[in-house]
Structure formats: structure tokens, C-alpha cells
Amino acid sequence: MATKLLSLTCIRKERFSERYPLVRKHLTRSRDGGGGSSSETAAFEIDDPISRAVFQVLGMTCSACAGSVEKAIKRLPGIHDAVIDALNNRAQILFYPNSVDVETIRETIEDAGFEASLIENEANERSRQVCRIRINGMTCTSCSSTIERVLQSVNGVQRAHVALAIEEAEIHYDPRLSSYDRLLEEIENAGFEAVLISTGEDVSKIDLKIDGELTDESMKVIERSLEALPGVQSVEISHGTDKISVLYKPDVTGPRNFIQVIESTVFGHSGHIKATIFSEGGVGRESQKQGEIKQYYKSFLWSLVFTVPVFLTAMVFMYIPGIKDLLMFKVINMLTVGEIIRCVLATPVQFVIGWRFYTGSYKALRRGSANMDVLIALGTNAAYFYSLYTVLRAATSPDFKGVDFFETSAMLISFIILGKYLEVMAKGKTSQAIAKLMNLAPDTAILLSLDKEGNVTGEEEIDGRLIQKNDVIKIVPGAKVASDGYVIWGQSHVNESMITGEARPVAKRKGDTVIGGTLNENGVLHVKVTRVGSESALAQIVRLVESAQLAKAPVQKLADRISKFFVPLVIFLSFSTWLAWFLAGKLHWYPESWIPSSMDSFELALQFGISVMVIACPCALGLATPTAVMVGTGVGASQGVLIKGGQALERAHKVNCIVFDKTGTLTMGKPVVVKTKLLKNMVLREFYELVAATEVNSEHPLAKAIVEYAKKFRDDEENPAWPEACDFVSITGKGVKATVKGREIMVGNKNLMNDHKVIIPDDAEELLADSEDMAQTGILVSINSELIGVLSVSDPLKPSAREAISILKSMNIKSIMVTGDNWGTANSIAREVGIDSVIAEAKPEQKAEKVKELQAAGHVVAMVGDGINDSPALVAADVGMAIGAGTDIAIEAADIVLMKSNLEDVITAIDLSRKTFSRIRLNYVWALGYNLMGIPIAAGVLFPGTRFRLPPWIAGAAMAASSVSVVCCSLLLKNYKRPKKLDHLEIREIQVERV
């Protein structure tokens, strides 16, 4: 029996860690000693969750082979059970990973004479954690690539993504081999600042600030009190700031409990202690970004204080009589007042304001890579130290004539810092979508106190961050819903547009779910909290969008490849430019008239070399894709379209074929009454009262649809009191019958009526035939053996489904419907919606096979579905789109989630991906074009014919402007509007008739 159970579970791919969560078992093994004459039994205890591994075993031909493999495996210590399937060449092993590993099991199978390869290892899946780290100090793709290489070299790291645009890293790692502390250390050793955002563990962390007169002993008492609470993992106290960090399981406890424990603690004369949630201000991404903006702004202002006088003394005052004479006054030998002023003012710009470029260069070069900081440091150093050389020579030589370039280095640094300031500001705007989502949660909430009967006994306004699971909160009109939950009292309309994009307010009544961050418009609601913190819908949306922005689009690989050799190539070109012009001048390959009066050939060559070095911009290439993806995914989230990263965006813009599931995708997903035909003169309200009283006792979906529709004719619509039904009988496959108000009521199909000799008139037969042609279910109603009415029940098409398919055709996208329903219903729905290609009676694996067939035919396929049976096809498709109202499994398998559950968003998703990708292309054209044109111009390619040259400070300004322009180009996506065709879609109305 156990073997059959294991085999069945292998087929169903259940997780054995759930079936056997923790087993404490004593295993015995024999150990031969002294020639085998004696043996001792060693018992060892294993306190370890069972893991499952599945191997493909080749070479087994019969049950004897399977038996030999099973025996060999079961001899190993730590094996709980083994099931060998010779027919399918599979071996499924349940084992304790602390006692035996999968490699030992594989070697044992091969020692038995068979070839084994691991297919699935649940231990690896369970042991993987994902942590997110914010990284400060990255300037270009070279920095992000360096950090990725560093992280991927750490033992236990399985995958690492570093996003330059949002300055974050997502690391998948095995906590048994590494830790997030080690990851932070490696990033900091690489020369960058690292701040942990989340650990990936199923715990939450909160920081509390304690106010009051505290001693070390009292802090220890608080620490012990908190550690004694169920669900608290660890408590860490920072004595300098009186801050307490608590790591806890949100399912068990919460921050309000911590504050109550702390504030209930009294230490003699110290009195009560006040605890509040600690706010560090600069921890969040937005706060950190604002701090970075302020830092660049201050640096730029200080650079102006020194650079403007340098510029004036070098470029302006030299042409003003009187001032020129003062500046040209010789102090020592050939050293002038102007040179001294420029040297003194340029030095703090070079070594104080420009210090960030030195540190950035050092960190990059220490790791064997080069970035933008290296180019800036080399270029400004060349200008500054050559200028310093001219000052020293002028001070020590009575006949030296030279020109300093202090204005070049100072202006170069000032313009680059200005560019960085504008770039950081623009990059900050690319993440505004996330900031807006995070700000949706209200600051406070009204907590209700209830007695045992559920009556409200009091209310209290609390910090919104103190809400815990199973709390009951009050939502007043005009207030935001404080947390996810369901309504236990009241009714209202809630504006969910900020989460789902749905423009119209959604009616809410008892039992309906509400989403934290949405706006209650009218009416008071009492909501029981079901999800808080990282589990909330808002937090999950934010996390999904953040993960999407971390994921690189395949086109980003182009920039990554270029960045590896870009800076070394630019340094080589810069040196070659200087050398070529220097040799040309020394060898008199160009006339001396080409040399400006204030320079010599060496200085002219140096200017060209520096210009090449500082005009090149790898940052523009690095920002081309991630900034567009950031804005695109943010805009999508605001439209109710959650796109899981750049890869999904890139694939979606190529889609030319969409496969639709029927139920819940093209249709509403639940039956409703769409038509009522009364054959006798009867009041509709009375008719439905009798029918509902009969059907309310049935659990059939069609019965529930009829009862739900009947409520519309009642004044007490929310909780109607139906007449009592006596002698209720449910006849499987036919219908129900009961006695209501002394009348015999039958509701069912033709077979039910025929069995009870109820005459079905011709017009009723026609109605049934019409219903069948329209993929509807015809239901007959008789009263006292006389047919009174015909109901048509169907799963109606979603509003605008037909128009959505038509718009897709206009976009040259082919639509196909695949469903598990019968061919009659499938063809009827397809005709109604306008789909030509239909596949019916398809199993889940057949849906996936159809997707693969379309891909083999050259189509780029998107699959749109909502159910568990759609998951294989969603995974197989180039782009999987899950209807937001569908199951969690379908949503997990998809690349794009449609929050509003309507088909219009399929069009929006594809259109947005096309617009985003065209923006990425435009960014690359600009970034590559800028470098391909700018570098030759800076090198002096136009100088021989036009005498036009690019001074280094202008080249630096152009470099800074190129990055800003790429970011601004991406920001234009924020103005995205969905296709105008979607604004004119007609809504299908449900028809109700009566005679």
C-alpha cells in the first residue's frame, strides 16, 4: 500500500516535505570489525525533514533490475524509502539530507550497474533563498557586471542579478553554504556600499525605538521578555540609539504585541517606557535616492564656487584691459597671478569635489575592471597635472612659455557632476510608479475591539504598521483600506483603480474581499484582516514590479558585452589620438597655422586625447534598456498589467498569435441566467420566488446561478428569506422537485419533465433548441405538472470580448481558442466572439502541445488563461498571460498578470511592450550613434578641414548630456496611453424577456 501511495505521489509530483514535515527516527546499521566476526549496532538519530529526489535510471529491463537498484539504495544510511519504476526508468528516493546526499545516491545506482542522472531534487528547491540588496556607488554597466561576477563567485550563490537603474541586486543562494552577511561583505569588498533590503526568509523584521530612562539591566529584561513571545526568532539591541530589532513570524505575532510587552515593563523609579516604530528616514530607496540627489546638488554648487572664477580668469578677464594686466603680472619668473589663482581654485575641485571619481576608479581597478570613473579620473588628471607642471616650470624657469588647462579639469568635473545630478533626478522619476504604490497604504487605521459575540466594544486609532492578522478594522467613507481582508459588516463601494486599474468603483458587502490601499467611497465597513506586511496584495505587486525591474531583457546583453571592452578601448583610442597628433606636430605633417596661438603641438594633442577620453559614454548604453523597462513595467502596473521583467517585455512585442482559454478567460467563468421566457401569465417576482425556494436546497452551479438571479426581484436582496420547500428531491442529471406553498415545483431538463409526463409545447422546444445553438443551457420549470417557463443559463462572454478579438486582428495577431468543453459549445462561443480556429475537448497537456505546434510553425505565441489546467500552456508559451482573478498557480506560471481580468488588457500589454521596445531601440540608436560620432569628432577628424575641435570641457558636458537624454527618452513612456480603440468598446447586455 505504501509503495502504491509513493508511486501515485510520484505521478502527481507532490512535495514530500509537506507529507512528512519532520521525522525523528532511529536507524541502525551494522559495522563489521575484526574480520567480520563481530558487529556492533550504531544507532543515530536524525532530526531532519524528509527530502525527495527523482533520478532517471537507464539500463533497467525488468523488475529484477528494479529490485537490485532498490536494495542498493536502501543499504545507504539516511534512506527513508525508495520506489523504482523500471517501466518509466525512474527512481524516487525519500531521504534525510543531513545523512546522505543525492550524489552518493547517484553513485550507488551506478555502482549497481546502471546509468543515473538527477531529474528533480526537492532539497535544493527547499534550501534556496532569495535576498535583495541595495547597492550604492554604481555608475555604469561595468560596475553592475563587476558586482555580478563577484556574487556569482561566492560559494552557494546560484544566480545573481544586479540592476543598475534601480541600484539593487537579487541573489538566489543556498543558506547552508552562504549567508546574506557574506554577500554584503563581498559587495563591500568590491568597493560598493551594500544595504540589506530583504533576507528571503519567511520572517519579518521591525525596528522599535524605546524612550525612557533605561539601564543595561532594564534593556536585558526587555530583550528576555520579547524573546519569550511565541514566534519571535531573535532580538537585537542597539544601545547607542535605544533601538530594538525584532525578527519574527508574522503568522504568530506582530509589532503591537512587542510594544505592549515593552510598555508594560516597569523598572522601579524609571516609570513606564514608551515604544514606537523606529524610522531611520534614509533607509528606503526613495529616501536614499533623495539623499543622493541632494549630495550631487551640493557638490555641483560647491564646484561652481571654484569653477566660475577659474573660467572667468582663463576665458573672460583675459580680454578686459586692466584686469588682464593684473592677471598677467609675474610673481616668480614666468609664474603669473592668473596661474596661481587658477591653480589654487582648481585644486579643491580636483581632489575634494572630484574625490568620488578617484575612489570609484580605485574600486573598479582593484577588481580588474574599468568604468566611467576611470575615464573621468584619467582625463581630469591629465589636464590638471599637466597644468601643475606648467605652473612649476613657470615658477622655476625665466623663459618658459606654457599654457595651463586648469579650467579644463575644473569645468569638466563641474559639468559631469551636473550631468550626474540631472541623471539621478531623471532616474528617480523612472521608479515613481513603485513609490506611488508604496505610498498607497494609509498611515493610520481604526482598530475595533469585539466581545465574544462579535459586538463592537471600542475603537482605537493605531499606526497602520501595527496591524496584525485577524484584527478587525473600521473603514470610514473617504478613508483608505488599511490592509487586505474581507468584509464582516457593512456595504459600500470601493475604488480599486490604484491597484487593478478598474475605473469604476466595486460594490462591497459582507463576505467580499478588500485590498489594502484602495479607497472606500461611501458606507462604513468592518474588515477582518487576512494579510499584512509582505503578504499583502500591495506588497506583492510592489515586489513583482521590483523583480521585473531587476530582471534583464535579452537585448541588455548587447550593452553588457560592449561594457567589458568599452573603457579599455576608449583609453587606447585616447592615447592613440594624443600620440598621432603629437607625432604629426613634431614631424610637421600639418601646418603650424593649425595650432592655436596659446598652445604648442603637444598641448593641442593633449586636448584631443582628453576630449576622446571624456566624451565616450558607457553609461548611456548601460541605461538604454533598464530605464525603459523600469518605466514600462511601472506604467503597466498603473494600468493593471503586471509584466514580470524585461524578457517578458521583449517577447511580448513579437507576439503574432494568441491562444485563449474559454472558461474564465473569454467568458465570465460562472453561469448566469441570461434569458427568461414565461409561457403563462404570471408575475416574474412570484415565478422566481417559487423557483429559488426549490433550487436553494441544491448545490449544483446552475441552481446557484438561478438563486442568485432571483435575488434581484427581492427587496431583501442581501439575505432573502425564501418560502419553505417540502419534500425536496434532487434527481442526478435531471433536476430537482419540491413542494412550495402547496404547489409542486419541478426545475430541470427535458428528461425530468418527460419522466413526470409534463407536456412540452412546441414554442418551448424551439426555445431549448435556440439555447443549445447559442451554447446555453435550457432549463424548464413546471408548476403542478404544467410547463410555466424556460430559463436560459450560460457562462456569458466577457464584455468587449468580441471587440477585443477584432482589435487583435487589426494588429495582425491571430487568435485561437483552446478549451476542454465540448465541440458544440466551443464552436458557438468561437462564432460569437469571432475566432476562426478552435480546439475543443483538450486536456491540459494537449493545450501545451498546441502551443508548441504553433511555435514550431514559426509563430511567437502568447497564452491567455486563468486556471490550473492552463498552467502547462502558460509555461510552454513564449508569453504566458494570467487573468488576475485566476488561481495563484496560473499567476505564478505566467509572464504577465492581467489584474482587471478583462481582455482589453491583453491588447494593452502587447501595445505597451511594443512601445517600450521601440523606446529601447531608440535609446540604443542614440547611445551607439553618440559614441560612434562623438569619439571621432573629439579625436579631431573635422579639424583638418574646418579647424573645428571639441574642447575637453564641452566633450565632458556632451558625455553628461548623453546619459540624461537616454533617461529622459525612457521617461517619455510615462505619457503612454492605451490604444484609442479600447475607449470605444461596446458592452454586451444580458437579456431578460417575459411574455
Curated annotation (Swiss-Prot):
Family label: Belongs to the cation transport ATPase (P-type) (TC 3.A.3) family. Type IB subfamily.
Phenotypic consequence of gene deletion: No visible phenotype under normal growth conditions, but mutant plants are hypersensitive to copper excess.
Keyword Glycoprotein attributed: no
Top EC group: translocase
Extracellular side of membrane: 322-340, 389-406, 585-605, 941-952
Function: Involved in copper import into the cell. May play a role in copper detoxification in roots.
Major localisation: membrane
Entry keyword tRNA processing: no
Ranges annotated as spanning the membrane: 300-321, 341-360, 368-388, 407-427, 562-584, 606-623, 921-940, 953-971
Membrane topology annotation: Multi-pass membrane protein
BP term (GO), one: response to copper ion
Gene this protein is translated from: HMA5
Annotated protein name in UniProt: Probable copper-transporting ATPase HMA5
Keyword entries, A-Z: ATP-binding, Copper, Copper transport, Ion transport, Magnesium, Membrane, Metal-binding, Nucleotide-binding, Repeat, Translocase, Transmembrane, Transmembrane helix, Transport
Topological domains, Cytoplasmic: 1-299, 361-367, 428-561, 624-920, 972-995
Tissue: Expressed in roots and flowers.
